Amino acid sequence: MSTSQLILELSLIGTMQLVTGVFLVRSYDKTDSVGTKVQKILTGLLGAFMVMAGTVKFFDPFTTMFAKQIALSELPFPTLSRWAGQLGEIFAGLLLLGVMIGNKALAAPIKDKAMQLSTLLTTAIMIVAVYVHLLPSVPAEVLPLQSKPPVMTLIILGLAWLNAFLYFRNE
C-alpha cells in the first residue's frame, strides 16, 4: 500500500469520525434512555461508515478491486451494478447522517422514511455483497479486508437491522 493511499484512507476515516463525533455531542440529551443513546451512536457510526465505504470506491486500489469483484461475480449490468453499489452506500449513509443531524428539526414521518430507506438500501447492498463473497470465482484478494468469509458484511447488516429495531422501538 502506498503512502498516498494510506494518507487518503486515514484522512477519510478521521474526517468521518470527527463529523460523527461532533454531531453526536450536539445531539446528546441526558434524558435519553440507554437504547436511544445506543441507537443515536449506531446511526452516526453506520452513516459515516457507509459514506466512507462508498466514497473510497472512487479511488485506487478500491475502484479496481470493486470492478474486479463485479466482473468476476458476473453480476448483471456491470456498470450499473458498480454505480448502484457505490452511490447506494453513499446515499444510505447520508440518510442515516441526516436522521442523526436533523433529529429534532425533521418531522417524524420524514425521519421514519429515511430510516426505512437506508435500512432497505443497506440490506440490499449487503445481501449482494454476501453473494459475491461466497462465489468461488471471486478470490479473497479483491474483497474488502481480503477476507473470503463475509464477516464484516454480516456485521454491518446486523448492525443496520439492530439500528432500525432500536429506532422504531423508541418511537
Predicted regions mapped to residue ranges:
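Membrane-interface extramembranous regions
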Residues: 2-171
